[in-house]
């Protein structure tokens, strides 16, 4: 698990077995490792595969992200849908914005409480044009974001080590990592 700077994310066609039907778009991603948050990795850059049922992986919309990558044999894979956009604070440390949506708020409770941050103007989430103003307000609560035009600017945030703990205790555990039971897991 690491903070990475996007170098490239390109779609590819994976080689599949005769009776295998892939329901996801496949991407090869290359990132510069800015900060290792958990695990071991010796390189300055990392390459991994990402699969997304909705098309282009959302993490690729951001220059920097906290990414959750696992090894399977000799290949590295992104843990499907698991990421946080992150931004460098004036102190130089990496932080993610406040929670996006009710589920993220629930998952973070007691682990990564968002607090006011002195963000730069590049700390925002782009808003999809098809989202209604009601959808935007529901996803980007006014205590954590300021919506201006097509951007939700961050007002609060949490450090990356706390955000890692959120995923570790929730979805990654459910997927059988960190002492969880993958047999009970679902996406």
Residue ranges and their predicted role:
Residues 64-187:
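Netrin-like (NTR/C345C) domain of secreted extracellular proteins
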């Amino acid at each position: 698990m690491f903070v990475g700077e996007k170098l490239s994310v390109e779609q590819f066609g994976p080689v599949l077995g005769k009776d295998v039907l892939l329901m996801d778009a496949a991407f090869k991603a290359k990132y510069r490792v800015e900060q290792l948050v958990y695990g071991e990795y010796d390189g300055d850059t990392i390459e991994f595969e990402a699969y997304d049922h909705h098309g282009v992986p959302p993490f690729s919309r951001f220059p920097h992200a906290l990414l959750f990558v696992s090894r399977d044999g000799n290949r590295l894979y992104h843990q499907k849908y698991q990421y946080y956009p992150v931004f460098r604070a004036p102190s130089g440390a990496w932080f993610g914005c406040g929670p996006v949506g009710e589920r993220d708020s629930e998952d973070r409770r007691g682990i990564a409480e968002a607090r006011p941050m002195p963000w730069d103007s590049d700390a925002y989430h782009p808003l999809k044009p098809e989202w209604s103003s009601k959808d935007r307000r529901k996803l980007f609560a006014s205590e954590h974001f300021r919506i201006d035009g097509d951007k939700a600017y961050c007002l609060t945030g949490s450090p990356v080590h706390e955000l890692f703990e959120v995923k570790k205790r929730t979805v990654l555990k459910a997927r059988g990592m960190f002492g969880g039971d993958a047999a009970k897991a679902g996406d």
